[in-house]
Amino acid sequence: MRITVHRGSNQIGGCVTEYESNGWKLFVDYGEQLPGAPMSDKKLEIDGLTCGDLQKSALLITHYHGDHIGKITELPPELPIYMGKMAKEIASELANHLSTVSVEHRKMAERLNNVNTFVPRKHFTFGEFDITPIVVDHSAFDAYAFCIEAKELKVFHTGDFRKHGFRSGKLSTVIERYVERADYVVCEATNVNRPEATLIPEHELQKDFEEAFTENKYNVAYVSSTNIDRLFGLYHAAIRTNRPFYVDAYQKRIMDIVAGRDKIWSKSSLYNYIEGKKPQKLIQRGTEFIANDKFIDFVSKHGYVLVARQGERFDKLLNQLPDEGRVKYLSMWNGYLDVSKAAYNPALAKSVGDDYRYMHTSGHCDMKSLDELITELDPKAIIPIHTDNPRAFADLFCDKWPVILLNDGEYFRL
C-alpha cells in the first residue's frame, strides 16, 4: 500500500489523502482550504481523483464540514463518493438552505443526491480495500474514522475527532472490537500547538449553560447550526432551567434530522426531545421574524434561550425582545471575532458585539487523548495531517513511535 498526502501535511483543513494498492485508489476528504491557508490559484490535479482513469477510484468523506467536503462539486460526476447517511442528510439540508443565495450550494445539493452512504461499523469493500467506518465524536455529527486494509496491512485514518464529547465514551470499546491494532495511524493534529491543553467536556459545558440560564432570564447563543451536540446541549440546558428554547425553521430541521431517528443515537436521551417541550420555531413572515405581542408577553414572563446567527434578521428580532440583563454567548471558535485572524467575520462580530460570554470547547482532540488512542492502536509509525505544526507533533511523539513527516504531494510506501 502507498500513502500520499496531497494536501494537509502542514495546514489545518483542505486535506486530501490517497491510499493506493495495486492500481486501486481510495481518497479521503476533498474540502475547501480554511482562511489564511497557503492558497494556490491552481486546482489540485490528482490522477484518479480530479482527472485520469477513475474506474478504480473512490472518495471517502469523514464528515460534512466544508474543509472536508466543500470541493466535491469540482470532481468528475462518475467518481463514487461515500459518507455517513445522517451526515449526508445534514449536508443536504445545509446545501438546500443556502441554494437560493449561492450557485455553489445548488451544485453541492445536486452532487449530494448521488453520494453513497455506508453504515457505522459495517465493513465494505472497494477493489483491493476493506473499509470499516468507525463513528467518532466531533463538532460535526455522524463523523467517521476509517480502518483501511489492503494486502494484510491496516491503516487507521482518524479524521477529526475528540475524546471530550458526549459520544466519546465508547471509542476504546469500538476500537478494541472492530480495529484492534493498526500498522499505521494517519491522524489529525489540530491542537498540537496546545499540547498541555485540557479541553472542557461537552457535558460540563452543558452544566455551565444550565447555571447561566438559571441566573439569567434572557439568553442568546451564537453557535454553528450544524454543531448538533451543542444545539442539543443548549436545548436540554434550557429545558432543565424552564427557559423556552427558540430556533429558526432551518435549525429546527437540522435538529429533527437527528432527534430519535436512528437506533444508534436514539438510545441517548440527548438526541430525543422532551415530551411537550420541543424546540420552538420562531415565527417568520417572508424573510423577517415576527415578534407579536403574545410572543413578547410570553418571553417577558418566562425568559428565553434563543439560538441566533449573524445578520440583520436576527439583529432586528433581538431589538424587539426584552433585554434587561440579557446575556449573549459565543459558542464557537473565538477566532471569528479576532480582527487579527484570517477567519475574522465582521458580520458575526457586529451581531455578537463586545459584551458576551465565551462558552465553547474544541471539536478536536487534545494531545493526551491522541496519545491514548495511538497507544491503543499500537502502530509501527504515525503520519500527522490536518496540522500547521508537524515538527511540533514529531517532537511530542517521536520518543514513543516513529513519526513520518510527509510534504504535500509526497508518498510513503508501507
Language model: regions and residue ranges:
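Charged, glycine-enriched surface loops/patches
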Residues: 397-414
